[in-house]
Every structure is written in C-alpha cells, then in structure tokens.
Amino acid sequence: MDKLSSKIRAEFLGFFKNSGCAVVPSDSLIPAGDKTLLFTSAGMVQFKQHFLGQSKDSFTRATSCQKCFRTSDIDQVGTTARHLTFFEMLGNFSFGDYFKKEAAAWAWEFLTKNMSLPKDKLYITIYKDDDEVAGIWKNIAPANKIIKMDEKTNFWNMGETGPCGPCSEILIDLGQETGCGSPACCPECNCDRYLEIWNLVFTQFDKQPDGSLKNLPRKNIDTGMGLERLSATVNGRKNVFDTDLFMPVMENAAEILKIKNEGSNISKLRMIADHSRAITFLISDGILPSNEGRGYVLRRILRRALRQGKFYGYNKPYINELVSDVLKIMEGAYPELSSKLSNIRSIVKTEEEKFLETLESGSEILSSLINSYKSKDINIISGKDVFKLYDTYGFPHDLTKEMAFENGLEIDEDKFKFEQKKAQEKSRVAWCGSGERDITFYSILRKKTGDTVFTGYDNYASESRVLALIKDGSEISELKTGDNGEIILSHSSFYAQSGGQSDDKGKIANNSFESIVEYIFKPAGNLFVHKVKVLKGLIKINDAVSTIIDIERRKQIARHHTAAHLLHKALREAFGGHITQAGSLVARDYFRFDFTHFSALKKDDLIKIEKRVNSIIRLNSEVCIETMAIAKARNAGAMALFGEKYGDEVRTVLIKNESGDGNYSMELCGGTHVSRTGDIGIFKIISESSAAAGVRRIEAVAGIAAENYILDEEAVIIKTSKILNASKEELVNKAHKYTSDYKKLENEFKSLKSSLISGEIDSYAKEVKKINGINFLSVIADKADIKALRTISDQLKEKLKSAVLLIVSKNEDRASFILSATADCVQKGINAGKIAKAFAASINGSAGGKPDFAQGGSKDLSNLNDAVKNAHKYILL
C-alpha cells in the first residue's frame, strides 16, 4: 500500500522536531520584504535574516515544508518525470548551530530508516576538495557509494562574492530501464536514471573579490528535498506525477475533457495538474491575474493550462473545477485553502472566460494572418503584427509563438521586443513627473542622516532639527522664500504616506521661517521626506524647527482608518474568512477598501454591513494600540496584510467588543486611529464595484465626510423635488411617471424613424453583389442606432430572401455594424461571426457573434468607407 504524501510530510517535520529543530510554517509564495525575488523558490528564502545573523528569533535550528514556485523549467513540465512549477520543499536548517556531521547522519537516517529506502540504491556526491565531509560520509555509507564532483555541481555560491560552500547531494538509482542505456552510466550522467533527492549545502566560506575563501564566523546548514520526488521514490514510482499529489487532479481533468489518462494525453494532463496546483496556491497567497509581475506569470500559466483543453475541442472553463481537487489533496497541510475555495474558483473561472473570448477572436485573426504569410511564402511573422495582436487584442505573445510554430512559422522576436520597448518608453514619458524619485539617492542620504523619529502618534507638533535640504534632486545648504524643496528632519509629527493611509499636511516653521508641507513620503526605510513650499524666510542645515500638522485633517483620516478596520471585520462576519484586504486608500474625503470576494454585493448586503459598522460606532468601544511580539499577535488572531514584512515587534490596533472583555477587531497596523469608535460619528457606504478579477471595492465615508455626503444627497432630493414639482413623498411616483412618458415618446420617435428607414430599403437592395453564388450587400446608414441597423437588416433579408448583409452606422466618433446571414447561406458555410471579426480587424475594431448574426464596432473611422466597399472579400475566406 502506498505511503501518503501527507504522512511523509508529517514524518519529516516530526523527525527534525525530535532533533531539536523549530517547526516553522511555510511562508507565502510572495517573498516577504525581499524585492529581489518574484516568488519564493526555495526553503531558505524565509530564513535569509537568520543566515545573516540579523533575526531576533530565539531558535538556531529549524525545519519547514515550504511552498515554492519556479518557472525556469516551465517548458519541460509534463514532458519529464521531475520538472514542476509548484512544489513543496522539505528542509532543515542550522544558523551557527549543528553542521556537517549531524546534517549527513540525520539525512541518511531519515531516508533509510523512516522512509525505508534501500541503502544499495543510494549514492552521495560531494565536492572534490571537501575532505571533512568525505570522512563523515565514509562512517555512514559504503565508500563505493561516495562520488567526488567538481565545483559546477557540488559547490554553492550566492554570487561572485559572499557566502558560499560545498554541498552533498543524495541520489537514488531508479534502474537501468530509466537511463540512457550506456554501460558507463553512473551518477554523473545527465540521464533520468539517477534522481537527486536531497541537497545538503554547507555554507562555511566568504568568497573574496580575488576568488580566495575565508572562513565564516558562523557556519550554516541549508538543505532541500522536494516532497513530490520523495513521495514518488518511497512508493516506487519513476515519475512525480504518479503520486497521490497529482493523480486525482489528472483523473478529473481527463474525465472533464473526455479523454483517457494514457498515451499522448499524459503530458498534457500532467501539465494541467501541475499548473492547477500552482494557480490554486498563487491566488491563495494573494496574487491576482494581471499584465505585469507576479500577476502576469499567474495569467500565463492559467492560460497555458486552459489551452490544453482546446487541443481536445473543449472550449469551456474547467481549470476552476480542478481547484477543488487540489484543495482535497492539500487542505490538511494548508487549512487556509478551505475558506478561500469559492473565491479562488471564481477568480479562475472569470479569467478562463475572459481568455476563451480572447482566444476565439485572437485565434481567428492570427489564423488569417498565418494564412496570409503562407500564401506569400513568408516564414517569419513580423514583430509589428505580433505586437499588434498582443497590444490591441490582448493575445499573448507566447501563444502567438506557439501557434506560429504549429503552422511551421516563426516570429520576429527582436522586432516584437523593439515594439514592446517603444510602447514602454511612451508609457514612461506619460508617467514622468508623477513624483517618484531615485530611491538610490535617498538610500545614500539615509546612511548619513539616519531614520526620522516619528512623534505623531502622540503629538500633533514636535521640535526638530534640519538634517538635510534638497532641491531639484540635489542636496543644498539652504532654502529661501519661494523655493520648492525637500526637508529631512531628526523628528517629525507628520505621518508619511504608507500602508494605504494618506500623508499629513501642515507647516514646518520657526521664528524666522515658514513653509507649507505639501507631501510626505518614505523612499528608504523610515527616512521621512517633507516636500515643502517656502512662504517666508531662510532655512539652513542644523536649524531648529517645529513641525505642526493640520489637526482636523489628521482626525478625519483617523476616523476613516478606524472605520476601514470595522468594515473589514463586518465583511468577514457577513461573508466568511476568505475575505482579506487586497488594497486600500485612506484619505481625508473618503476611504477605499479592496477585498477578495467572488461576486458583487447586493444592496441588502451593503445595508447590513453599514448597519453593523454603525452599531459598533454607537457602542463607543475603546480603540487600543499595543506593541507585541509578532507570534503573540498572530496567535491572538490579528489580521496581517499579505506580503508585508513585519518585524519581531508589531504595532497592533485592537477595537473592543460589545462587552469590552475581548476584541471585536485586531489588525497589525502602523496608521493613525481614533481613541474610541464613537469618535467616528457615522459611517456611510457610497459605492461597491469590481476592482479586479475576484476583488471587490467599497468606497465609503465617515465623520464629517459622511455628514457632507448626506447633506449633498439631501440637496439633490430637494432640487429634484422642485424640478418635478413634487414633495419628497411624491418624488418616486412622479419620477416613474415622467420616465414612463419619456419611453412612450421615445418609442413613437423610433417608430417614425423606422418608417423613414423603410423608404431606403429599395435603394439599398440595388447595391447587392454576387460573390461565389452568394448575395452580398454592404451599406453605410449614417447615424443609425443599433436597433435601426437591425430593422434595416431584417427588412433587407425579407426583401432579398437569401443574402449576407453588412449594415454599418457611422457617428461622430464611432462606427457600429451588424452582419447577418440568412439560413440558406449559413448552410452553404457562411459564418457571420467569423466574417464580422475579419471586417472588424480591418477597421481596428472588435466583433463577436454566431454563424447567422454578429455585431461589432470601432473608434477608428479613417478607413471605414474603403473597408465597407471591400468587405465582399471576406466571403471568400
């Protein structure tokens, strides 16, 4: 009977716990506080500060099962026995504690005793010059199983300089049948016979610029072993996909696609299973599909998986269904998946639906393009055409490349990159002047001045000293009347924009100097940069000044920030634990709160949420600020922002519950808040909308802003009452009556317009052309709306009996069209939807529809007349 992967995972962590290691939970796939990495790709990532000796954690040895994601081998996923994008890395670590002897002995014990792997099948590779580890292994394993390798395979470097060290790899012989067949095949061979299971890295040196090695004061251990590989090995499988981590997903995918999990289908099903796991965990960790960064990678693998279904003629969303299979397998180790299932599935399904639409329209345009290139015997699609597909129609570059390859063509990569870069440059020009500054400049400045001490939690004003002055991007010695510049202070009561909260406004002044503070930001660490306009006087470095904030602005922002915490909690109460903050803006006039949720909130839901928040406000509950250990805060249930890097000590905002003996809300937060919920006054939701796939957005107001909003609404009602000559009580009924009367008049007008159109039908009918035995007519009906176009089309079909009709309306800034075909033309192979898309492409527009009817439009009128005249050519496609 197979050993479950969940049991292997638990046994590994238990083994090293018994060896004195702290069991550390998996970190997010978004590396916390490390902007050099796009994803967490190894178990050691979350321990970087420990390896550098900069962590305040008490443990010096640890073990973990870390979620990892890599795309370096994405093209090999499904085609080999071992490559994956998402995987779990089992690891044990030492930070100046145990070293080679213990690491080697424990690894061998766990594999041979706990996992019962045959000793005669295991091999150990070591660095050729590491005599220390060679001696250790000789006391553990047979000498003929220990193989010395060179620096390329068995010496780890962080970079050209810095921490480095030798490593030992443990491999297992999977048998001759899996290898290259050569009699000389050995662990040094690159075939599939010898599978690396575990890598033990011994970080003991500091590489110098001249290449020499110095001993590190603290020697560290970093090991990594893929759970998927170990599970396959323990259960006698030659392939990671033949384990309980993948098989249920593959089997359900095969059932959905109505194919067998065998033969040529296997590689596609493996890719689908791998990508489904990755998609589930990426979204669970807060990544959403987008066109850049992590979101783009997610979008790419989701689309890549979905497209495998189209290979079998399956044109519906299905990856979202596989998310449930992933959950069943993984929820024991990652219980947070359960509360997020509905949201993850909704996000995936929405993205699938969008891509299927893109794929349909883009594929047809690309197919037409490919046929055009083939007819001209051109084998390379221009980069300009590839970029247009990407930029105008949202068709992925990598998909264009794949489809071109399938048709024996290539794409001009260099020209595509040139067009892409050109578009990026345009974007940069538009972006210039947005206020972003060179972070390197401020990082260097911070080393000289140190961080700013923020005094604003308890004080609206503070005494300070000028540490640096900046103008036009350069340090200067003074600022004078009329100057715009930046001031760096030793202390500041101003809140710098961060954590979604807007910055303070106010003054920096002394007896002979006064400036208005326009913006405060933190470009590096806790260095506060105050952008100012000097009203009078002169300020120099080392001058003493006072910082004085706009108190009413601060109080109003605080009302909004505390209200945002109440809203967050109320949403989780109403809809469940899958609700998490996905972004926010806390300003003076309003606040915006983005949260993960799979559907729009109903009006009744919004009323319920609003009432709940106001009920907590009326309780006048105490709002407490406590600084506590991060572990204590998390254990107490404090909400934390995903992807944020927190120190060992965190600032926690607690809002007391109804009885006052517990907390209604508890969040890690560095922002400013009211002292009691009653200080908020009143809370009012002003809108709810979609912010992104799987993310909803609520905009709301509180305090004075809510009061002003309600007064404005009241003013609109009063004004409307006067216009309609109705009391408030009569207003709704009277508005309904006027609306009803307007619709009647509108229908009468349309009827009259339709009568006028009917008079044009005979003249239109005279323009019919015969194309391959098909009656084809294309006409422009100026300024007709879409309903009028339908009327013209219906009347022409009735008159002509058999025809394909393109009826176009041209207005001031847009063209709209419908394309219809009678039933007999459809039977002859005419597809109105395809013709409409081809025509839309010729006018830089878009279209969609069915074989008998389609519609579309474009904002580009430059080529419209010629395109309509030449539209008959699409009948020939």
From Swiss-Prot:
Gene3D superfamilies assigned: 2.40.30.130, 3.10.310.40, 3.30.54.20, 6.10.250.550, Bira Bifunctional Protein, Domain 2, Threonyl-trna Synthetase, Chain A, domain 2
Single GO biological process annotation from the record: alanyl-tRNA aminoacylation
Protein's cellular compartments: Cytoplasm
Pfam family, one: tRNA_SAD
Principal subcellular localisation of the protein: cytoplasm
Reaction catalysis annotation: tRNA(Ala) + L-alanine + ATP = L-alanyl-tRNA(Ala) + AMP + diphosphate
HAMAP family referenced in this protein's UniProt entry, alphabetically: Ala_tRNA_synth_B
PANTHER family for the chain: ALANINE--TRNA LIGASE, CYTOPLASMIC (PTHR11777:SF9), ALANYL-TRNA SYNTHETASE (PTHR11777)
Domain notes: Consists of three domains; the N-terminal catalytic domain, the editing domain and the C-terminal C-Ala domain. The editing domain removes incorrectly charged amino acids, while the C-Ala domain, along with tRNA(Ala), serves as a bridge to cooperatively bring together the editing and aminoacylation centers thus stimulating deacylation of misacylated tRNAs.
Full protein name: Alanine--tRNA ligase
